Amino acid sequence: LLTNILATHQVLEACQKNNVPILLTSTSEVYGVAEDEVWTEESKSLIGPTTKLRWSYAASKMIDEFIALSLFEEGKISPIIVRLFNTIGPNQLSQYGMVVPKFIEAALVDEDILIHGDGSQSRSFTWVDDVVNYLIKLAEIKAYGEIFNIGQTEEITIKELAELVISKTNSNSKIIYKSHEEVFGKAFEDPKRRTPDINKIIEFTGMKPTKKIDFMVENIIDFKKNS
């Protein structure tokens, strides 16, 4: 929490001092458990209570955004803010709980694939190359003072993701389920779905995401087999 807020504030102050623009990476977590069908940049945030400690990350990222935008309004810095939605790629580590590499690594050795909850929660995964291309384009067009969702609109449930991974790897893995409380304790809350509206970034950049989940999973499988 403090690392996100204090370190970001120091970077923003350095940008102000040296008159350097900044591209600030925020997160889809700032929307919390908002019930909108898809989340636009203007959707209201609905994060959980302070007793659910997992929301500290979302809260710290929201504060980062507030600081950056307040400094922009004062004419002190030139920020571009992006909210990333479940970025994945071939070299992503599973040790921090990233679901796609975690499932693939288990499937490649026929281990059980563990799903937290009932697997009906859905996510929208975005290929890392698409994310990088968006970041470069936003910096080039100098979209200062703006907030953008960066993500893919294609949804998949976590259960469907596990089944896709098993199919693509020809694995003998079984899917097992554990409740969020059993894995993380009572101080955890998980959004049921997380899908971005990306009309704004398409309008500003003229670009759409290029990769679908089948490609992403196949690419990561090939990478892990050969690394």
What do these predicted regions represent?
Residues 6, 16-17, 25-55, 70-75, ...:
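Active-site "gating" loop of Rossmann-like NAD(P)-dependent oxidoreductase/epimerase domains
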Residues 7-10, 21, 29, 45, ...:
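Conserved cofactor-binding/catalytic machinery of classical short-chain dehydrogenase/reductase
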Residues 56-60:
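Active-site helix of classical SDR
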Residues 118, 147-148, 159-162, 170-193:
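C-terminal "lid/loop" region of Rossmann-like NAD(P)-dependent oxidoreductases
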Residues 128, 182-208, 212:
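Conserved C-terminal active-site "lid" loop/helix of NAD(P)H-dependent oxidoreductases
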Residues 131, 135, 150, 161, ...:
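Non-catalytic, hydrophobic alpha-helical segments
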Residues 199, 211-227:
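Amphipathic terminal alpha-helices
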